[in-house]
Amino acid sequence: MVGTRLLFAIERKLSAQLGRNGDILALEWTNNLRIALHTEPLTLIQGQMAMYGLETSTTKLSGVASWYGGYFHGRLTANGEIYNQDDFTVAHRTLPFNTYLKVTNLENNKSVIVRVNDRGPYIAPRSLDLSRTAARCLDSEHTGVVAYQAVVLQQNAPQMTLKPSPPKTEDMANAKGELLVSNF
């Protein structure tokens, strides 16, 4: 969205059909527009911060992170969601559900933003269990375990919404269904 104007929306069904994370698709498409308009593309972190309306806090964590997928994909998480290894999520033993973290791989300085939706890990000394997609963004999928530093993020603006406000132009009159709307 630009102001109150909807530029595009990604249906959850489309991202599933493409086998791609909806956040990454939204960022790629937004960056295609930005490049066409001779504007710097956004990094993954910049896009996620804008998409979720987040800002950094002073609370930091560090430790060892692993990732989980395969066997758990499609199973129930501790907060009642169905686990999707392609989402930007993380398990933590005590952080409140829906807490956002900016996690940085200390070996290569790559970062990703994840949302707490599960409990774990339960193997010492690990303190985070990342989704497969989050691990890929940190280049930790093959190593399996990585030292990290994380910053707790807090909301500073409205999050993306599943139902956009009613269209104000005739060309949007046929917009239907549940949409994933990006506002960055």
Model regions: which residues?
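Non-catalytic extracellular/periplasmic "stalk"
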Residues: M1-T56
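A general structural-boundary detector
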Residues: Y52, W67, P121-Y122
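Exported/periplasmic cell-wall-interacting domains
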Residues: L76-F184
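Short coil-to-beta-strand transition motifs
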Residues: L54-L61, E107-S111
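Short, basic/aromatic beta-hairpin or loop at an interaction surface
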Residues: L61-Y83
